[in-house]
Amino acid sequence: MKEMPGKEQRNTRQRSAIRDAFERADRPLSPQQVLEVAQADVEGLGIATVYRNINALLEEGWLAAVDLPGGATVYERSGKAHHHHFHCDQCSRVFDLAGCLPNIHRLAGRRFLVARHELVLYGTCADCRAVTA
């Protein structure tokens, strides 16, 4: 199937609202979370439009997928420095964690050649802890 010229550069109100949602949140978001944030800018925005735009932004390289083991995929701005994630078990939000443990590849031992790694910590975020305190 041939791409329409300029399709990847298409910038609609919906696309702008979805981009703004990621920039304002500054953390990985699920499509439902994107919808909730972007609807403040574009009334009547639907989940199908969010999915279409997420796919287009992935193709453009503006977004990157974050696959959580045993969980749903969330999305974040691409081009960030190497980092890891924290998943809140209470509210299901995902947060970026800066930095990396030095020599983490040594955990694999000598039998394996590590090409890359992803670390996800699970627990309760500060907002949820404050509610239960």
Regions found by a protein language model. Name each.
Residues 50-60:
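Basic amphipathic alpha-helical segments that dock to polyanions
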Residues 13, 24-30:
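Short capping segments at the starts of secondary-structure elements
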Residues 17-25, 37:
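Short amphipathic alpha-helical elements of helix-turn-helix/winged-helix folds
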Residues 46-47:
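Short coil turns linking two alpha-helices in DNA-binding domains
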Residues 30-43:
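DNA-recognition alpha helix
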Residues 1-20:
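Short alpha-helical segments that sit at the start of domains
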Residues 62-65, 69-133:
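Non-DNA-binding regulatory cores of transcription-related proteins
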